[in-house]
Amino acid sequence: MARVRPLDTRTNQTRVAVEMFGMDEFLRELRFAPSEVKKAVKQGSKEIADKVVVEMKQRARIVWHQEQYETIVPSLRAVQGTVPKIKIGGARKAAVGRRKRRPSAGELVMGAEFGGRREETTQQFPIHRGRKGYVLFPTIRRLHGTIKKEYTDQIEKVLRKVAR
């Protein structure tokens, strides 16, 4: 199931994660694996995350409030790690010329993804949809099975190489 980790206030970034059953045990064992195995797992994880980022960027182009995603989309990036990771947000400023204090991508992520309009200060965002989201989370939910399958395949491929 997809979930959001808390906003990192130091770097203004949000992490999106997919949880898989049995990952904790695997990651514990991976810490003691040879460095070639760790490197291969990290590269495979980044490849999977890159595919998800491409899908998110495509979906962000067709949503009806795509102007808000123009600031967020360049900050979407895959991060190398033992599991597929995607970072969102950052300090890149929105391209609005009339405001003294322009919002950063990290400040727009949650409003553009989940909506607003319940408070006076969130009228610029689309209608609030609860946990559904508009671009990021629907993409993760749709690709959840693919992510799990590809990650499992990557791990099996690495373990087959080690067993030789």
Q: Where are the predicted features?
A:
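Cofactor-/ligand-binding subdomain signature composed of acidic, glycine-rich
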Residues: 106
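Membrane-proximal amphipathic alpha-helices
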Residues: 87, 95-98, 102
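Short, Lys/Arg-rich flexible segments
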Residues: 1-93, 110, 114, 118-164
